[in-house]
């Protein structure tokens, strides 16, 4: 039989543990809750359907990078980056991914949105052609047909690309078509090139036996970044610790995806079993993921840590958005629209970065 003093000490220790757990709950949620109810529900939107460029969210959730901070993140499908940015900015979702340019556009139009982690340094906007079209450089498109979609995110930047690349668009027959028609026209050789986001188009061509080539806008001095993590300015000001937990968890997931792509794919398919049913599903999603991994290699991330947003590139990107996308908007200030507060905690070694780059020959061979 235990002594009374022993029982009292045991009860005291339990009480202290419970108290510490409660204090942890206050740190994350601002509200003291019982230990069994520490998980806080968080709403999160993707910019599109589950795919390679947003696979990191499923890794962050499955690997517990968010739940260890007491966060239960519900991931919703999106219908486009602009729609995702709008939904985040107006508070429909607390967090989400969207193309960096879409976030800047909405900020210019007055939406109170702020970026808290840079995930991709290249959206792979560009011209997509086939190996037998004779189009190797942009100027080769002169005298040929080119298909594009007006509602696609790269469309507004085609004039800037043409100017930088020395392409005279007046000498190109431009067809404005539906996205599905656009991709078919290239296969049927009715056009010599199309515009679009390579990670969403090229893997499907590869799986079906075609030989696409990509001419990236970024190759010609247009830093048009891919997915970034966004929230509302008010939430960042009010709950910086919560925003940091979401950003840190996503940055940890980026590191995992960069170093362990096959394990990341397995997590993705487990979370989205319907994505494994398509023809060539593994090859298709692996290539889409590798586009993302390729786009995550940047001197800013190497020097300052995963999630870092380089101010100079963002200023150029903002100039492009103001000129071609939101000319009637108010130019957003970098410090008020982009935060590097949560970058710097997650790093790869120089050897890791080199090995990641060596593993991406499947992407490199597609670039002109």
Residue spans for each PLM region:
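N-terminal secretory signal peptides
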Residues: 1-14, 18, 22-29
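Pocket-lining segment of extracytoplasmic ligand-binding domains
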Residues: 101, 181-183, 190-280
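Conserved C-terminal helix/tail region of periplasmic/extracytoplasmic solute-binding proteins
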Residues: 314-368
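N-terminal signal peptide c-region/cleavage motif recognized by signal peptidases
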Residues: 32-34
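Short linear loop/turn motifs
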Residues: 74, 82, 176, 219-220, ...
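Short, glycine-/small- and polar/acidic-enriched structural segments
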Residues: 37-199, 215-216, 222-223, 368
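Secondary-structure end/capping motifs
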Residues: 239-327
